[in-house]
Amino acid sequence: MAQEVIKIRGGQTLKGEVNNHGAKNSAVAIIPAAILAEDKVTIEGLPEISDVETLVSLLGDLNIKTELDGMTLNVDPNEIENAPLPNNKVESLRASYYMMGAMLGRFKKCVIGLPGGCPLGPRPIDQHIKGFKALGAKIDESSSTSMKIEADKLTGANIFLDIVSVGATINIMLAAVRAEGQTVIENAAKEPEVVDVANFLTSLGADIKGAGTSTIKINGVEHLHGSHHQVIPDRIEAGTYMCIAAACGEDITINNIIPTHVEPLTVKLKELGVDIQVGDDSAVIQRSTPYASVDIKTLVYPGFATDLQQPITPLLFMADGVSFVTETIYPARFRHVDELKNMGADISADNGTATIKPSKLTGAEVYASDLRAGACLIVAGLLAEGVTTIYNVKHIYRGYTNIVSTLKSLGADIWTEEV
């Protein structure tokens, strides 16, 4: 069967402007959250990615009228019906688990296929389940392919998360907004996307305090009305283009950013020696090698984002010494390492830390094992001498809007082929 590949002839200098899109990690939670509304909802600034399309079609399976026009989604839930959600859609998309919290909040029950998405090693949803149980839900996990969750009624509870989890924080919020009484989530995730989802729910009439801190308080309400919401800019997409600009850019401007959201990355790029000028909602970056070696450790927000650990790695081959990247969130998130070795990189990974030495990359055939590994291989391909062919590009399209045409507009020699 023919599949699409991305091909890159490296070594070009890129210049121009990039308009950053809405945050994938917000969008994939806000679309399911629209189920909780009892009237029409408009969501603007959505990224044009396959994950959004999959979620919109899942809403259709619940008899919700949807209209997706570019970056704007209109949702009319007036004739919503509860229905089991099929595996074939759910298994392609990790964030489909937000349908659990949203359907539990709306109907007090749901049957849903088990979530898929990027294979990053163990990412259990035990904290989500712990939260649902605390609110009064019973969970039937007897099937290997789906999960049944139901509650006679949902009652507010104090929930302490054993690990800081964006997914669990948001999912518990979704289930709790219409529960009876107060829910308190302790050790909550503080990511900007958590705040964005809380702001969306508040615009529907939810009573949520403390989003963006480690303690979130939710007072349940009986009804949620319609609203209009603009998704925040994507700090990971912006960060990926910042890494690309630092690798091979000459005066690249990235528009539609929130500087504080990308600060953990800009601090590291400046430590490398990258020339960055940050404005109110944009950044101008140019390559300024040779770079200094740096150590990077991924942490929950406001630390260095795990989703940018892979895209920044190719920059470290341009440093004048040994760099170390330690992954504390998903210690198995090093599937890009073998692919980079195929390109001639001097890199190894052991016990959650990658050791990266100065290297000259050459084009090769490589496989994108997950979304951000794919982004890493694009940065590497732009730096490499010769042609790089990236397979399994469906992962890349899950998180980056029109990345090939965007890079082309900056002067990259990049194209797609059917093979």
UniProtKB/Swiss-Prot annotation:
Phosphoenolpyruvate binds at K24, N25. Its EC number is 2.5.1.7. One of its GO terms (cellular component) is cytoplasm. The keyword Ligase does not apply. UDP-N-acetyl-alpha-D-glucosamine binds at R94, R123, P124, I125, D126, Q127, D307, I329. Pathway: Cell wall biogenesis; peptidoglycan biosynthesis. The keyword Cell division applies. It catalyses: phosphoenolpyruvate + UDP-N-acetyl-alpha-D-glucosamine = UDP-N-acetyl-3-O-(1-carboxyvinyl)-alpha-D-glucosamine + phosphate. One of its GO terms (molecular function) is UDP-N-acetylglucosamine 1-carboxyvinyltransferase activity. The active site is at C118. The modification 2-(S-cysteinyl)pyruvic acid O-phosphothioketal is found at C118. Pfam families: EPSP_synthase (PF00275). Belongs to the EPSP synthase family. MurA subfamily. NCBIfam families: murA (TIGR01072), PRK09369.1 (NF006873), PRK12830.1 (NF009470). This is UDP-N-acetylglucosamine 1-carboxyvinyltransferase 1. It comes from Staphylococcus saprophyticus subsp. saprophyticus (strain ATCC 15305 / DSM 20229 / NCIMB 8711 / NCTC 7292 / S-41). The gene is murA1.
